[in-house]
């Protein structure tokens, strides 16, 4: 039985791109981590988020991060890497590598970043099969099986709610509606949906950079910052490298 969301504590998740960034997150008091397909593609392979990483690539990063952190880790499993049988295997391997939860999405298997155009999604029946396959592989009631849906951009709010209800019935115990554009839509979702809802707050994405308070008031209980720290690290590194390139390194200002 799910407690009403207004009593839930807000959970902030930071994307760990490697064990070092996971240590930084813990130092600041962040209570939960996230490993994303985009993060593995960007940071471990220097590639864009276009379904170019394999299950083994993500498991490798998960094991490294789990090796130095005891924080809960939610892992992006994209479309599950294959058929129902594969999804069951994916889920079991994620659990044994130390994941505290996973999310699986309803895009077609040649997926794209959720904030880019031309996304294609599968039928709700096919997605329910994905969720059931994952659910059957899970024995721990506390394990988070989150359904990510990209339906909002393709089909609008009502169809997103319909899909979400089916996904929960199939065994999802949390919802990740991607690329939602207004607080009103989050509120409408949270009023209809019985499980925790995640908001993906990524700079330069389709979702405005709403505050924690705004999202909490709209019924969101998990806020994900998938790229904020990575973008800041990248910008700082670029600035330092540029300075080194154009001036004597000894004259750098301390950072």
How should these model regions be labeled?
Residues 3-4, 36, 169, 232, ...:
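Intrinsically disordered, low-complexity regions enriched in small/polar residues
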Residues 13, 17-71, 79-195, 199, ...:
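Alpha/beta enzyme core
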Residues 72, 98, 196, 226, ...:
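Proline-centered helix-kink/hinge sites
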């Amino acid at each position: 039985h799910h407690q009403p969301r207004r009593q839930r504590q807000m959970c902030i998740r930071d994307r760990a791109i490697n064990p070092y960034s996971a240590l930084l997150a813990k130092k600041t008091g962040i209570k939960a981590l996230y490993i994303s397909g985009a993060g593995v593609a960007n940071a471990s392979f220097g590639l864009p988020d276009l379904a170019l990483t394999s299950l083994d690539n993500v498991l490798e990063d998960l094991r490294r991060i789990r090796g130095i952190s005891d924080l809960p880790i939610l892992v992006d499993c994209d479309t599950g890497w294959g058929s129902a049988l594969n999804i069951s295997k994916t889920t079991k391997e994620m659990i044994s590598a130390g994941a505290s939860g996973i999310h699986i999405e309803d895009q077609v298997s040649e997926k794209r970043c959720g904030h880019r155009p031309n996304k294609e999604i599968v039928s709700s029946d096919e997605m329910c099969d994905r969720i059931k396959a994952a659910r059957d592989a899970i024995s721990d009631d506390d394990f988070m099986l989150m359904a990510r849906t990209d339906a909002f951009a393709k089909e609008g709010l009502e169809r997103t709610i319909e899909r979400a209800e089916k996904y929960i019935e199939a065994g999802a115990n949390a919802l990740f509606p991607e690329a939602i554009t207004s607080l009103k839509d989050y509120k409408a979702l949270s009023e209809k949906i019985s499980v925790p809802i995640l908001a993906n707050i990524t700079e330069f994405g389709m979702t405005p950079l709403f505050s924690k308070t705004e999202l909490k008031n709209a019924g969101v209980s998990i806020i994900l910052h998938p790229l904020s720290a990575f973008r800041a690290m990248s910008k700082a590194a670029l600035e330092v490298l540029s300075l080194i390139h154009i001036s004597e390194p000894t004259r750098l200002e301390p950072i």
